[in-house]
Amino acid sequence: MAEELVKPYNGDPFVGHLSTPISDSGLVKTFIGNLPAYRQGLSPILRGLEVGMAHGYFLIGPWVKLGPLRDSDVANLGGLISGIALILVATACLAAYGLVSFQKGGSSSDPLKTSEGWSQFTAGFFVGAMGSAFVAFFLLENFSVVDGIMTGLFN
């Protein structure tokens, strides 16, 4: 039975990928195709902005709840500072990857595979991650107000 469900991708066993009912489903293909890394028509800076917004927003929570300042009054600020530090490190790593992977003046059909395109992606990532980290901090600091708005307290 497993032989019928799991087979080589496109019938080629040398690709190194298996076709399964999950990986070949239309839902999974649509989901992955809509991720910013694979979506058609996005400029590198918009890809970076979208990826950065997602990462900056979810980086703050673990630092607030699990970080060394989790039981203090300044846990949110500590989470913000730690998140900013991690965003700076990630941006430096993205920039270093772009410097060593793509040659200046190189041409490619994919703008993300050029030095200029990767630089734009990195800039977008930095702006998006920093912005969403500050949004997450603002929401955590003003949680009672936001909760009141959502539960209809101010109607």
UniProtKB/Swiss-Prot annotation:
| One BP annotation, GO | photosynthesis
| InterPro entries, sorted | PSI_PsaL (IPR003757), PSI_PsaL_sf (IPR036592), PSI_suXI (IPR022980)
Keywords for the protein's UniProt record, in alphabetical order: Membrane, Photosynthesis, Photosystem I, Thylakoid, Transmembrane, Transmembrane helix
Q: Keyword Membrane on this protein?
A: yes
Q: Does the keyword Membrane apply?
A: yes
Q: How does it sit in the membrane?
A: Multi-pass membrane protein
Transmembrane ranges, per UniProt, are 80-102, 117-139
Gene Ontology cellular-component terms listed: photosystem I reaction center; plasma membrane-derived thylakoid membrane
**Which Gene3D superfamilies does the entry mention?**
Photosystem I PsaL, reaction centre subunit XI (1.20.1240.10)
The similarity annotation says: Belongs to the PsaL family.
List the PANTHER family. Answer: PHOTOSYSTEM I REACTION CENTER SUBUNIT XI, CHLOROPLASTIC (PTHR34803:SF2)
What name appears for this protein in its UniProt entry? Answer: Photosystem I reaction center subunit XI
